[in-house]
């Protein structure tokens, strides 16, 4: 004799409502985007400053020359690096690096050595001299338009106000890394535990 399973006393619309509630109770996927220099990493020992049109700027030629493996490995971590590591280990998160650096294997090795390997690295191409804020907006904007990332909450950490301003229309929350590193605290709503 074949027995039929008992009929559910729950209506289809009620079951659909339960599925909807369960899906909406799931934590929303977050994308944490970190700049590197003066955000997560202190590489100031490699920086040579110069005056250009009355403004103090980074000498990019000297920077490139000083970006040897030996010097990169002398960089140190800033307080925000601890939070980046927590984000990497957390569920429902992607961690991206978006840097104006031209990333070398030594840069990737440095991140790995400190447990800071992100899901994705966006970086400057070798001969690209696009202004940082334009470059970052372009790189991040292309990816956030892809379907898997459209509904994610985005949190961007950078030390330069010009970069934060450029990404205002793309990012849910722009956070000044310099201020966070100075006070050593992350806003409570992004605690990963």
Language-model features, listed with the residues they occupy:
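Alpha-helical substrate-recognition element adjacent to the catalytic core
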Residues: 27-130
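C-terminal cap/substrate-recognition subdomain and adjoining C-terminal extension
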Residues: 27, 31, 102-193
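Short, small-residue-biased leader/transition segments that mark boundaries at the very start
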Residues: 4-20
């Amino acid at each position: 004799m074949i027995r039929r399973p008992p009929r559910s006393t729950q209506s289809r619309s009620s079951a659909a409502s339960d599925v909807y509630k369960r899906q909406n109770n799931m934590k929303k996927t977050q994308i944490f985007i970190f700049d590197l220099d003066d955000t997560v990493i202190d590489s100031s020992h490699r920086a040579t400053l110069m005056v250009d049109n009355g403004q103090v700027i980074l000498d990019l030629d000297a920077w490139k020359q000083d970006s040897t493996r030996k010097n990169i490995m002398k960089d140190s971590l800033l307080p925000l690096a601890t939070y980046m590591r927590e984000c990497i280990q957390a569920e429902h998160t992607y961690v991206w690096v978006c840097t104006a650096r031209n990333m070398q294997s030594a840069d990737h090795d440095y991140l790995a050595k400190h447990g800071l390997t992100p899901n994705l690295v966006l970086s400057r191409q070798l001969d690209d001299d696009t202004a940082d804020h334009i470059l970052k907006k372009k790189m991040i904007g292309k990816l956030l338009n892809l379907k898997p990332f459209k509904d994610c909450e985005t949190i961007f950490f950078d030390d330069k106000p010009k970069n934060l301003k450029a990404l205002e229309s793309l990012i849910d929350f722009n956070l000044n890394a310099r201020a966070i590193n100075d006070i050593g605290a992350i806003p409570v709503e992004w605690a990963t535990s």
